[in-house]
């Protein structure tokens, strides 16, 4: 028999690692891949990917929004657990994801702190992205403010999802929740038909000057309006002619109240929160 050569078998796909016994919910794309300078990206920043296999530094994954399947290097993604616990991204990437279009105020993530290893940080979208350090006690309980501790991160998230309690705002939705939301379908509305010349607004000023004027001062076909609507128009015109002094007094009182509230707040110290 002649010599024969065996083809080298393809490397078997390794099972996914299980940190703390949890499978990641999805991968979050941190930057467009491939780079737009090289070719049109297959996966874009902010996309959520479902893992197919771990190829040793590379992931085989499928996009949850486009359905495209391909490989992506591990440095371009972060693993996400519980929908809000991000593993493998820093402060800058967290801010980029939280500032993506359609990200709502209160969107948040928890990530490993860059400045304190073994600790976590809570990043929240507000007017700007705010970062709060999460401390861990020797008994493995967590806290942001020392006066309030939690047995696990999930309890911490649940609490601050109900009340801000010193944070910049209430936690609303995990980061990237909107990235796979189905686009809203606008219900088709029936066409609106307008009748010509319902109200001659050029004659309104004359009505204010001469309330005892003609029988139909607005030039309106009264059959087109109910009695209540005609009364509403008349009430509106009478209100617009009133003096605005009451509004000025109200505005001044509001400004005084606001000034008083600012002075009052100095007597109450907010709970100590440590920004990361």
Swiss-Prot record:
Q: Which domain of life is it from?
A: Eukaryota
**Biological process (GO), any one:** signal transduction
| Mutagenesis or variant effect for residue 224 to S | Abolishes interaction with CBL. Does not affect dimerization
Query: What SUPFAM superfamilies is this protein classified in?
Result: SH2 domain, SH3-domain
Tissue expression per record: Expressed in lung and fetal brain. Weakly expressed in heart, adult brain, placenta, liver, skeletal muscle, kidney and pancreas.
In the record, Phosphoserine modifications are located at 253
Q: Where are the transmembrane segments?
A: none
Name of the featured protein: Src-like-adapter
According to its UniProt entry, this protein's organism is Homo sapiens (Human)
